Design a protein with these regions (language model features):
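Cytochrome P450
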Residues: 1-426
Length: 426
């Protein structure tokens, strides 16, 4: 069963939104903007951001918004504008180099220390080099070979969950999170005895209780990963980290020490958030649409791949792409974002844009491929998620196995959109 659908050419919408370089009468380039509070747009934004995004999109594709701490960001909404922003060379992910010019933040993110030399924090050509070396080993063949192990892990975790005497559990704690953590640890060759510590670091960095706690967790993880790299260099295994240590391109280029441990750190953190959110949001979408759940239960073998793609489109695992900083003035959707502007790209809204997806607020696991293809759940352009095939594989196995083994599974109580838990009963 393929992890991805074949690509098809994309033609930008010709509806009411202006093209990426066009000025509009309402918002000509250079016009000052007053920052808006998303909670003023919709007080329920934290629980369900989609109505606020839709209101903003109806006014235009780029908006200056303010955060709870007084931060100011340029928020990009709508499919065409988001694709443009994701591929704009004027919007940088290299905070090490361009962070000092950022405006609207109390301070730029601290990215100078060890563990930050990964491709998510680099622009081409540095990013191109790092991704090329990583892609030599993190291949679709390696990911496909993981499916039997992912299936065994899923079954073992479900065995433990279904043994609960009160027939209740949280799917995130019982299944989604331990599955993802175990898969990443096995992929990197991390010994069983070290995984509890790894879980603590991952929890704190992916969902920090404070900026200081996240930095402290990274500071603890980096020496461990450095030692792991040294051990794998001395005694290679058949894991991904060992392969990355020894891979080189045609010119003899290799990842250096900091790049190796940074790559391991990226796999831990980026994969944690996207996959766990994907599984939890996907299950919640199914339970919120009993007709679609019934369809999938009746024919999971045929429908599960399309259902996974619809889950990704309908409620993106990560609502906004990692922030970028404008290294030069850039026009997107008729609005000039000034040099130093910090830009958030609303992936979740892009995939609910009626200019690209018919009836986008309808959850339809039988949506025709042409009507779901091209979603931005995993980003777009050079920073498109390298781990997307693995996330799709895990989602497909988990959803299919849940439906097969837990025919009476149901949500255990009401959940808001922002709730990361998925309490269930059976």
């Amino acid at each position: 069963m393929p992890d991805t659908e074949p690509a098809e050419p994309y033609t930008p919408a010709t509806g009411p939104h202006p093209g990426p370089g066009a000025a509009t009468a309402a918002h000509p380039p250079g016009e000052p903007r007053e920052a808006v509070d998303l909670l003023d747009i919709d007080p329920g934004f934290a629980a369900d951001p989609y109505p606020a995004y839709a209101r903003l999109r109806s006014r235009g594709p780029v908006h200056l918004v303010k955060g709870g701490g007084g931060e100011r960001f340029w928020l990009v909404v709508g499919y065409d504008a988001c694709r443009t922003a994701l591929t704009s060379p004027a919007l940088s992910r290299d905070w090490r180099r361009h962070g000092p010019i950022a405006t609207g933040l109390p301070a730029p993110p601290p990215v100078d220390g060890p563990g930050n030399a990964h491709m998510l924090l680099r622009d081409p050509p540095d990013h191109t080099r790092l991704r090329r070396l990583a892609a030599r080993e993190f291949t679709t063949r390696r990911v496909a070979a993981l499916e039997p192990r992912v299936q065994r892990l899923t079954d073992a975790l479900l065995d433990a969950m279904l043994a609960a005497p009160d027939r209740r559990a949280d799917l995130v704690d019982a299944l989604a999170y331990p599955l993802r953590l175990t898969v990443v640890c096995e992929l990197l060759g991390i010994p069983d005895l070290d995984r509890d510590a790894f879980r603590g670091w991952s929890d704190e960095v992916a969902a920090p209780t404070s900026a200081e706690a996240a930095r402290a967790a990274q500071a603890e993880a980096v020496p461990y990963l450095s030692g792991l790299v040294a051990a794998k260099r001395a005694a290679p295994g058949d894991d991904l980290l060992s392969a990355l240590i020894h891979t080189e391109d045609e010119d003899g280029d290799r990842l250096d020490e900091d790049e190796l441990l940074s790559m391991a750190f990226l796999l831990l953190i980026a994969g944690h958030e996207s996959t766990v959110n994907f599984i939890s949001k996907g299950v919640r979408a199914l339970f919120a649409h009993p007709d679609q759940l019934a369809l999938l239960r009746a024919d999971p073998g045929t429908l599960v791949t399309g259902a996974v793609e619809e889950m990704l489109r309908y409620d993106a695992p990560v609502g906004t792409a990692p922030p970028r900083v404008a290294v030069a003035p850039v026009v997107i959707g008729g609005t000039v974002i000034p040099r130093g502007g910090v830009v958030l790209i609303a992936l979740a809204d892009a995939d609910r844009d009626p200019g690209r997806f018919p009836a986008p607020d309808r959850f339809d696991i039988r949506r025709p491929p042409a009507e779901r293809r091209g979603h931005l759940a995993f980003g777009h352009g050079v920073h498109h998620c390298l781990g997307a095939p693995l996330a799709r594989l895990e989602g497909r196995v988990v959803i299919g196995t849940l439906l097969r083994r837990c025919p009476t599974l149901a949500l255990d109580g009401f959940l808001g959109h922002g709730d990361r838990r998925v309490p269930v009963r059976w």
